[in-house]
Amino acid sequence: MAAPTGNGPVIPILGFLTCVAFIYLSFGDLWFGLKTEGELAFVKRNGTQFVVDGKALYVNGWNSYWFMDHAVNDHSRHRVSAMLEAGAKMGLTVCRTWAFNDGGYNALQISPGRFDERVFKALDHVIAEAKTHGVRLLLSLVNNLQAYGGKTQYVNWAWQEGVGLSSSNDSFFFDPSIRRYFKNYLTVLLTRKNSLTGIEYRNDPTIFAWELINEPRCMSDVSGDTLQDWINEMTAFIKSIDNKHLLTVGLEGFYGPSSPKKLTVNPERWASELGSDFVRNSDSPNIDFASVHIYPDHWFHDQGFEEKLKFVVKWMLSHIEDGDKELKKPVLFTEFGLSNLNKDYDPSQRDRFYRTIFDVIYKSAKRKRSGAGTLVWQFLIEGMEGFNDDFGIVPWEQDSIQRLMIEQSCRLSRITGRHLLDKKSIEMCSHRP
């Protein structure tokens, strides 16, 4: 086809471009605003409250620790998107998941300083999908338990390389070589540029916060000094690289030597002899909010369901009081669940258990106290039996649980006024009590 000659087509083209420019200048904010309507801002702390864009944020969310693992392979990656979409439809704002897998199958960190790019891209996918669905992520950085490597794997690496001081798992906290391993991992992770979004993790507001370690215990030093020293060092190191994100420890919430008057709140005596100390650990200067777990099934041996419910209320109110008076920081209950393996278990008990916990948070939020929200342990989708435990739930298969989750989202949204600004909240909450 011959190239056009003369000025014939030029005037119509210029007219078209002029029209486009006029539309853009006149209505561009409205048109392109649709693309940025769901953009997330960094979550910050104002005293005992989380805030986003100057408004309080109360968290209603869940745990799906398995996201990165399932995002590695094509055949299972869709589960991440499906769970995030389902969470968003329930109005859930935060999902807690693992940003670690040390050694073993689908390891992110194969050995100290060696990373599998394939698995890193899986984590990139998780973060990008969360952003797409408007859900923030609480990313945990290492496990106290052996699952997915944890501190045991770090100790084994040091031992295998002939630099370990001890074969004890607790040497993770005091061995200089292991501390260097962990700091190197932190540096690589925090400065990772997402292959899908082009944003470094430390600059991505999709990440709600970092969790230093899941359920830390250091039973070789019940004074708590060893764990406290490690927390202080590692949190300062993280903040030197990333001062934009919030940071929490990842505690279960057990009281230690620094709170002698609170020891009776612990489930049993053993809980004060784990080397962790809720108030002292959470009061570390670089910790932005406290984290607490709720597992009466694991913590008591002979109590019935009604006794467990009473404990839950006492446990939560005690920690909220700490947030208000001692720490002056938000308190987020980052795991809670009721086992379906109890000998007297009935599905209706789970409804009451969830309702009790949600009511405590709702009342705290109404009074602008430090109870900042909850994360259910754990949500799955169909076909994940191998990842289920006695706490796992496919929420849309249990209508009563799904209704409770949506109701809590709406209640918390109304307190902050966010339902007046967000179309999703308006639609979801318009017929809710």
UniProtKB/Swiss-Prot annotation:
Entry EC number(s): 3.2.1.78
A GO MF term: mannan endo-1,4-beta-mannosidase activity
InterPro entries per the UniProt record, alphabetical: Glyco_hydro_5, Glycoside_hydrolase_SF, MAN-like
Chain residues that bind substrate: 98, 214, 295, 377
Active site: 215 (proton donor), 335 (nucleophile)
Localisation per UniProt entry: Secreted
Gene Ontology biological process terms in this record: mannan metabolic process; polysaccharide catabolic process
Top class in the EC scheme: hydrolase
Keyword Secreted: yes
Tissue: Expressed in roots, stems, leaves and seeds.
UniProt-listed Pfam families: Cellulase
Annotated glycan sites: 46, 169
The organism's place on the tree of life at top rank: Eukaryota
Entry keywords, A to Z: Glycoprotein, Glycosidase, Hydrolase, Secreted, Signal
Catalytic reaction equation(s): Random hydrolysis of (1->4)-beta-D-mannosidic linkages in mannans, galactomannans and glucomannans
Signal peptide: 1-28
Principal location class: secreted
Record's keyword annotation contains Hydrolase: yes
GO cellular component: extracellular region
Protein family per UniProt: Belongs to the glycosyl hydrolase 5 (cellulase A) family.
Protein known as: Mannan endo-1,4-beta-mannosidase 2
UniProt organism field: Arabidopsis thaliana (Mouse-ear cress)
